[in-house]
C-alpha cells in the first residue's frame, strides 16, 4: 500500500537534511497519514480510508460530501 492520501492525493516530499556544518543530504518527508473511519451521510455508511491530517481538518470544516465534490472524487468507488 502506497503512502498516498486517498482523498487529496498528498504524497511524500523530497527535501534536504542540513547539518550544522551545512552538509546537505536528501531526505524524504512523508505525509502524515492516518487510517480513519468516516461516516458518509449521503451513502449512509462508514468509509475506512487513509487520509492526511490536513485533509481531516478540511473535512471537519466543510464536511465529507462537499470536500469530495470539490476534489472531483466519487465516494461510491471507495
UniProtKB/Swiss-Prot annotation:
Checking Pfam families in the record gives:
Ribosomal_L28
Provide one Gene Ontology cellular component: ribonucleoprotein complex
One function term, GO molecular function aspect: structural constituent of ribosome
Coiled coil segments of this chain: none
Q: Which SUPFAM superfamilies match?
A: L28p-like
Keyword annotations? Ribonucleoprotein, Ribosomal protein
Biological process terms from the Gene Ontology for this record are: translation
Does the entry annotate any disulfide bonds, and if so which pairs? none
Q: Which family does it belong to?
A: Belongs to the bacterial ribosomal protein bL28 family.
Q: Which NCBIfam families match?
A: L28
| Name of the protein described by the UniProt record | Large ribosomal subunit protein bL28
Amino acid at each position: 500500500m502506497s503512502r498516498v492520501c486517498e482523498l487529496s492525493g498528498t504524497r511524500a516530499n523530497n527535501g534536504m537534511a542540513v547539518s550544522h556544518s551545512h552538509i546537505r543530504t536528501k531526505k524524504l518527508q512523508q505525509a502524515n497519514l492516518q487510517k480513519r473511519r468516516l461516516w458518509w451521510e449521503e451513502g449512509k455508511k462508514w468509509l475506512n480510508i487513509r487520509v492526511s491530517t490536513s485533509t481531516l481538518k478540511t473535512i471537519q470544516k466543510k464536511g465529507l460530501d462537499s470536500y469530495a465534490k470539490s476534489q472531483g472524487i466519487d465516494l461510491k468507488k471507495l
